[in-house]
């Protein structure tokens, strides 16, 4: 992974699912980011579940959230991270499936 990616803001701890590649998972609703170290064979659904547990522990259903890479939703979350086009240092966006109203 490049030095640039490791210098980006994220929580100090890393979620370790296995050895392989390091990606960032960003959740704009909570303005937070986690690093995930994962094997390239890990399904996106497992990465999503681990990141949700860390970023949004309010018992939200996995089905309420989508994972995006480069602005596009990853429609089949059962595929390995290596088949999504993600590379070491990529950032996945984890966000609500439906837009939520802004309250002031």
PLM regions: where:
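Ubiquitin system architectures
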Residues: 1-104
């Amino acid at each position: 992974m490049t030095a640039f990616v490791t210098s980006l803001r994220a929580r100090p701890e890393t979620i370790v699912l296995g050895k392989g590649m390091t990606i960032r998972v960003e959740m704009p609703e909570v303005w937070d980011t986690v690093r995930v170290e994962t094997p390239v064979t890990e399904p996106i659904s497992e990465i999503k579940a681990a990141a949700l547990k860390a970023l949004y522990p309010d018992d939200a259903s996995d089905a309420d959230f989508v994972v995006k890479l480069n602005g596009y939703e990853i429609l089949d979350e059962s595929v390995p991270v290596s088949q999504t086009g993600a590379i070491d240092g990529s950032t996945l966006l984890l966000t609500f499936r439906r837009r939520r109203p802004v309250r002031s």
